[in-house]
Curated annotation (Swiss-Prot):
Main localization, broad class: cytoplasm
EC class name: transferase
Entry's EC annotation: 2.1.1.228
Residues the record lists as binding S-adenosyl-L-methionine: 114, 134-139
Signal peptide extent: none
MF-aspect GO terms: tRNA (guanine(37)-N1)-methyltransferase activity
tRNA processing in keyword set: yes
Protein name in UniProt: tRNA (guanine-N(1)-)-methyltransferase
CC terms in the record's Gene Ontology section: cytosol
Subcellular localization: Cytoplasm
Length: 231
């Protein structure tokens, strides 16, 4: 899997990609992360990448030329045909685990991080295949959403996690949120670990975890709870 990130702030990605799971995945050659500074591809002598919007309005809009030339460089350099180009925007479809699973099967994903008031619509018409949002709130740019997508997709790729089964137990499996976790000590500040988890009875432990997943999902994400009952 190769991730290609188009951004105005490449330094945001460096520290994250040099830590923990992502670092190991890159070192193993399971994933590649290529970062491109859109400003480097601007044909403006001052490397300007934004301009005032036609029709007026607040803020600036990212101009199409630097983005388009960055895109052409990526697909030419890496010989990519029919690429998935994802624009991170509040206007997009809300990202979820099902989308992450679908994307984990791809060979190349290009992530376009917007900034300012957004990007020229013609870029969306020309190269963008999907517009994706990570939630109903506004961020300064697309860099944090891009990191979220890279992390959530990468952990679904075989070999990235230490134990293949570990991601299958996590939240959103079967549309249920994850059950509570406990570790030592057994009693902390008067709060005790549920006795069933200390019983050694794996059947009862599994039942408790299932019941807790259902309870938590019903309380916090009723939309997912309804989906789980439809199966």
């Amino acid at each position: 899997m190769r991730f290609h990130i188009m951004t105005l702030f490449p330094e945001i990605f460096n520290s994250y990609m040099d830590e923990s799971i992502m670092k190991r995945a890159v070192e193993k050659g399971i994933i590649e992360v290529h970062i491109y500074n859109i400003r480097d591809f601007s044909n403006n002598k001052h490397k300007k990448v934004d301009d005032y919007p036609f029709g007026g309005g607040a803020g600036m809009v990212m101009t199409p030329q630097p983005i388009y030339d960055t895109y052409k460089h990526i697909i030419t350099t890496h010989n990519i045909n029919n690429p998935s180009v994802i624009y991170l925007t509040p206007k997009g479809k809300v990202y979820n685990q099902s989308m992450a699973k679908q994307m984990s099967l791809k060979e190349d994903i290009i992530l376009l991080c917007g900034h300012y008031e957004g990007i020229d619509e013609r870029i969306i018409d020309l190269i963008v295949t999907d517009e994706i949002s990570i939630g109903d709130y506004v961020l300064t740019g697309g860099e944090l959403p891009a990191l979220i997508m890279i992390d959530s997709i990468s952990r679904l790729i075989p070999g990235v996690l230490n134990q293949e089964e570990s991601f299958e137990e996590e939240s959103f499996k079967d549309n249920l949120l994850e059950y509570p976790h406990y570790t030592r000590p057994r009693d902390f500040e008067g709060l005790k670990v549920p006795e069933v988890l200390l019983s050694g009875n794996h059947k009862k432990i599994d039942e408790w975890r299932r019941e807790e997943s259902i309870r938590i999902t019903k309380e916090r994400r009723f939309d997912l709870y309804k989906k789980s009952n439809e199966k």
